[in-house]
Structures are given as structure tokens and as C-alpha cells.
Amino acid sequence: MVHSQLPVAAPLRLLCALLLLPSATMIPGGLYPRSVTDPDVQEAAECAVQEYNALSANAYYYKQLRIVEAQSQVVTGAKYYLTMELMKTKCAKTTGKPKVYKEIQNCELPPKAQQEKLTCHFQVWSRPWLQKIELTKMSCN
């Protein structure tokens, strides 16, 4: 009786072991971790900071301190899910042409006692063939 179970048990154990291995294949529409230094992630972060400052009612610009986490999802294009830390700068938003990302990143920070840091969650949708990248969702605290 024991011998009759062996042919079934061995393949079943092998199948279970294979299912426990990390999968190298991508699941369509799934979220995947991305390196925070990846150029596509950096481009999405620039868009997020630029749009945050354009939409924010704050009188001062906020600059990127760091990207805490980055994930992407294949959609019609790519959607990036970013967790970022932003810091309020000394650069005031004045009338005229708004500052671009690189200018904002060069803004000085206030003294430690006056610093305001935000943790933000951004979703950025990139469609390179249309030369379009846009912020679709944000929340900061």
C-alpha cells in the first residue's frame, strides 16, 4: 500500500516546492518593486514634485528629499507608485514663471527648527509613445 502512494506523493511534493519558489515571471497588471535610482522612476518623481508644487496652495516650494519606495504596474504605458519625502524650502512661489524641478531641487532648506517634511504617496502614469507623463493621484501627510 505504501508503494502505491509514492508515485503520487513525489510529484505532488515537487509541485508544492515549485509553487513556493519566487516567480521570475510577471503577472499582467501586477505591482513590481523598482529601484529608486531607475531613470524611469526618477522621471516619475520629477513629475510628482513638479505637479505637487503646482497644485499645492503653500507659499513655498517643496523639494524631493528621497524616494522611499517605488513600484510600477504595466497598464497602457506604466503607472508608478512612489512613496517620497518632500521638504519645504526657502524658495517662495512668486508671480511669474513657476520654478522647474531642477531649480526647486537647488532651493535652500530652512534651519532645522523650521523644517517641514512631508511623506507623500504619488501615482504617475507614463505613456512614452505619446510623450506624456502625468500625476494621477497624490496624498501627503
Curated annotation (Swiss-Prot):
The Cystatin domain is annotated at: 29-129
The subcellular location is: Secreted
Expressed in which tissues: Expressed by the venom gland at an extremely low level (at protein level).
Main subcellular location of this protein, as a coarse class = secreted
Sequence motif: Secondary area of contact, positions: 73-77
What's a single GO MF annotation on this record? cysteine-type endopeptidase inhibitor activity
Any GO CC annotation of this UniProt entry: extracellular exosome
Q: Which Pfam families does the entry mention?
A: Cystatin
Residues marked Reactive site (site): G29
Q: Which InterPro entries match?
A: Cystatin_dom (IPR000010), Cystatin_sf (IPR046350)
Q: List the disulfide bonds.
A: C91-C107, C120-C140
Coiled-coil positions: none
Q: Residues of the signal sequence?
A: 1-26
The domain of life for this entry's organism is Eukaryota
The alphabetized UniProt keywords are:
Disulfide bond, Protease inhibitor, Secreted, Signal, Thiol protease inhibitor
Q: Keyword Signal on this protein?
A: yes
List other remarks.
Negative results: the recombinant protein does not inhibit calpain-1 (CAPN1), a C2 family cysteine protease and legumain (LGMN), a C13 family cysteine protease. Does not provoke cell death (PC3 prostate cancer cells).
Can you tell me which family this protein belongs to? Belongs to the cystatin family.
Protein function: Inhibits various C1 cysteine proteases including cathepsin L, papain and cathepsin B. This protein has no toxic activity and its function in the venom is unknown. It may play a role as a housekeeping or regulatory protein.
Name by which UniProt lists this protein: Cystatin
Q: Which organism is it from?
A: Tropidechis carinatus
